[in-house]
Amino acid sequence: AIKVKDYSARTNEIIGTMPLGVKVGEVFTNYGQGSVRVTGNTYDLSLDGSGFFKMRVTDTSGNDHIRYTRAGNFTITRDGYITDADGNHLQSEAGDLIVPTDAEIVIDRDGAVYANGELIDQIVVTDFEDYNYLKKFADTMYEPVEGATEIESTGALLQGCLEQSNVNVVKEMTQMIAITRAYEANQKVVQTMDSTLDQAVNSVGRV
């Protein structure tokens, strides 16, 4: 993901000592491992560890592009192609992964694909040396930019499972409560200062 930092010029004008507000200084993607949910669906795939599935994406002009994702909720088409919900094709060593529609499909931890016990292909799982060279594409995909270095993935592939969000709900809720309390405390300080100034103004008026 591309980190976005605040490079806007600072103003030389100072009004009092209170900050005039806040804004986002940096945005980044958390690539940490999410929890795994067992679905039992043959074409639901999850990566245990680092790495990405390789996808062939066709744009509206009919041009093909390679993108990468950790979203493994795949399905099989009537022709046997393995695709995501948008019709993008999962890539194997042979290109688009295609399997017999009437066979029992087993995919092992290394990405080897078996049809009725016979090895037919190998799913491509890759990784990158520095995720700062990945640009977000759509909701769940990434595109490497100039300078990206592709490396071998150390993650294992889990069939019949899906990776869930890596957001820690309890932690985020705790942080939100802490922020709310800090806001309330600051609000009370402002109210106290306002009351003090009001009393001072009224006292001066009586003098």
Description of each model-found segment:
Residues 1-207:
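Amphipathic alpha-helical polymerization modules
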